């Protein structure tokens, strides 16, 4: 089983991402978080250690890039996939360790490639 964290402050988008992942990765065990702080709490307080994290970038409070930096430190083996509706964030993701950048409008077409790039399949 591959534990995959999904963090998106829009629950509908998180559920769409979850469904897309399940269609292309049978071994996925997904867990959705609506805030970066909820995901960080699961990691630091519950010992949750996802092997993959699919992170929206634009979120209230802490953005997905800052969340990725913290996950990089807390769970070094976690492969980060950024998911956003805004191409303008592309340059900023290089401040973190990540494996893929997916535009939300291309989710169904790209998520399989992104998951394969993590090396967890």
Locate predicted features:
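Two-component/phosphorelay signaling modules centered on CheY-like receiver
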Residues: 2, 11-33
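Acidic catalytic/metal-coordinating carboxylates
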Residues: 35, 63-66
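Active-site residues of response regulator receiver
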Residues: 8, 55-56
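Acidic, metal-coordinating helix/loop segments flanking the phosphotransfer/catalytic sites
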Residues: 18, 32-52
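Short amphipathic alpha-helix used as the core "switch/output" element in two-component signaling
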Residues: 41, 65-77
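C-terminal output helix
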Residues: 106-115
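Alpha4 helix (beta4-alpha4-beta5 surface) of REC/receiver domains from two-component response regulators
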Residues: 66, 70, 85-102
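The feature encodes the CheY-like receiver
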Residues: 60
